[in-house]
Amino acid sequence: MTLTRFVTKNAFRNKRRSLLTVLSIAFSLLLLTFMMTLWHAFSLDEGSAESAQRLVVRHRVSLTFALPGFYREKIRSIPGVVSVVPVSWFGGIYKDQKPENFFAQFGTDPDEFFKTFRDIGMPDDQIKAWQRDRQGVIVDDTLANKYGWKLGDRIMLQGTIYPVNLELNIRGIFHSSPDNKSVYFNTKYVEESVPLFKGQAGTFSILADNPGT
């Protein structure tokens, strides 16, 4: 007797029991779906409508492989692309390697960052200060509150992937929804310190003119 026939035979041996079993499982799944829907509706922040217009381009094999920098202009030439900016993971250590001191760190292009991430809020004077300072960094307000960071403070990120320690000046404190707990600095600072990585990008973030592009 095959397994399928055995299961079918026993399922129809007591039709009432089988029906109640199926109904109880279905009800449990329905209840779980309902609870997850409520939790999603009341607890999660979907972010801005503009975030739906952003795309990320990465290496097709893995995030550990960098993309050539000249891809940026190729992507920019695609119809529907409003702006494109490199975003490269740094993966440095702040203070120590304790999990509570871990946060995301990215190298990017300050001149085009806010053209792509227009839903991130930061005063214009802070944006200009960041763009002027090659060692400038902007930090999420959640991190600023956690560590007591203020404008003008200097922080150091110890390199792990890149053989360089970055000494960064806090030039801006931004707010995003939801909180992204990240910092962004000028990728040219890393390229000048480690020429081997010049002209590469971990990913490209793209802003499309509409979500359907």
PLM features: residue spans?
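A generic structural motif
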Residues: 61, 109, 174-177
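Helix-boundary and loop/linker segments of multi-pass membrane transporters
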Residues: 9-13, 107, 130
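Soluble periplasmic/extracytoplasmic beta-strand elements of cell-envelope proteins
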Residues: 54-58, 85, 102-107, 138, ...
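Diglycine-centered glycine-rich loop/turn motifs
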Residues: 111-138, 144, 150-157
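Hydrophobic, regular-secondary-structure patches
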Residues: 26, 30-104, 122, 126-133, ...
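N-terminal Sec/SRP start-transfer signal
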Residues: 1-32, 43-44
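Extracytoplasmic
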Residues: 52-54, 70, 98-103, 132-134, ...
